[in-house]
Amino acid sequence: MPVVRVLRRVACWMLQSPACGCRAPVLPSRFLGTSPRQIPMDANFHSTSFSEADQQRVLITGGLGQLGVGLASFLRKRFGKDNVILSDIRKPPEHVFLSGPFIYSDILDYKNLREIVVNNRITWLFHYSALLSAVGEANVSLARAVNITGLHNVLDVAAEHGLRLFVPSTIGAFGPTSPRNPTPDLCIQRPRTIYGVSKVHAELMGEYYYYRYGLDFRCLRYPGIISADSQPGGGTTDYAVQIFHEAVKNGRFECNLKPDTRLPMMYIDDCLRATLEVMEAPAESLSMRTYNISAMSFTPEELAQEVLKHVPELQVTYNVDPVRQAIADSWPMNFDDSNARKDWGWKHDFDLPELVTTMLNFHGSESRVAQAN
């Protein structure tokens, strides 16, 4: 027994000795398989150091949403096909399944998420699992579970395993009392949707984990994202995607927002590039953990006028959805993204004319292929 006591003292001395360069972290009790989920006061996690030249191992949660598939394709060009794992709780379409690694991942299942990170040696995690604004209002309890409880699981796994974590935020993180034109990075945030509330929660929790545990948390507040190869997913800005589908398909479009509703928008290529750029930015260049990013700002009427230059036969009508309109009226009209441009060199490529041309070219080509088939 004296030998055991001596060995125990030596082990404790080694763990706390300055010679080892760090103090061994005390893991949250949940990491040890116990309950309740409580983080001790002296816990201290620091992201595993790695050279930027090292090959990243990437996990994307909520990968079958509007942005996940495009992000996976974009990152695979940078890190290699097999180093970017797409995940979701739904069965992927065949083309997604064949394009690279795909696995089942339920962010509400902490053990499952932890096993994926460990078994695949994940270093970067992009957390896209969320219920969007309009869908969230229709199912608040589910939105609360996915957007908040799921986030807690992701934060804990990322902290435990020293990951670099990206969590997208949104224009929906602001509310009617926020300055709207422009909206700065730091101002009052009192959103009126469960989606917005959950995103403010994510921003603050990520920042807390950064300061408290050393988690390398990075976040961008996305404007409305417009993408050619995905269907609208229940967001308030979906009209700006749907108009292109309808213009090419049947020449008629009914908008559910007022014609003068101005919101910040961005083409998906700019969005994906900004996401990678902020993740690759040197830590010392980041003055904050959450940044606004923007590219353009327009109204449904301005978008329709630009589309009409290419599709003059398009008929646009307005049938305002009061729920979505109320949400849009509480959101920023313009984003101030000067900090992102100053700190890590953000610069957008697509303005409204380029956006419209690109979207119509894509859907026009898609329509011609369908007709040929």
From Swiss-Prot:
GO terms for molecular function: identical protein binding; L-threonine 3-dehydrogenase activity. It comes from the Eukaryota. The keyword Kinase does not apply. GO terms for biological process: L-threonine catabolic process to glycine; threonine catabolic process. NAD(+) binds at G62, G63, L64, G65, Q66, L67, D88, I89, R90, D106, I107, Y195, K199, I225. Pathway: Amino-acid degradation; L-threonine degradation via oxydo-reductase pathway; glycine from L-threonine: step 1/2. Transmembrane segments: none annotated. The keyword Transit peptide applies. InterPro entries: Epimerase_deHydtase, NAD(P)-bd_dom_sf, NAD(P)_epim/dehydratase. The active site is at Y195. It catalyses: L-threonine + NAD(+) = (2S)-2-amino-3-oxobutanoate + NADH + H(+). Signal peptide: none annotated. It is found in: Mitochondrion. Its EC number is 1.1.1.103. Keywords: Mitochondrion, NAD, Oxidoreductase, Transit peptide. Catalyzes the NAD(+)-dependent oxidation of L-threonine to 2-amino-3-ketobutyrate, mediating L-threonine catabolism. This is L-threonine 3-dehydrogenase, mitochondrial. It comes from Bos taurus. The lineage of its organism: Eukaryota, Metazoa, Chordata, Craniata, Vertebrata.
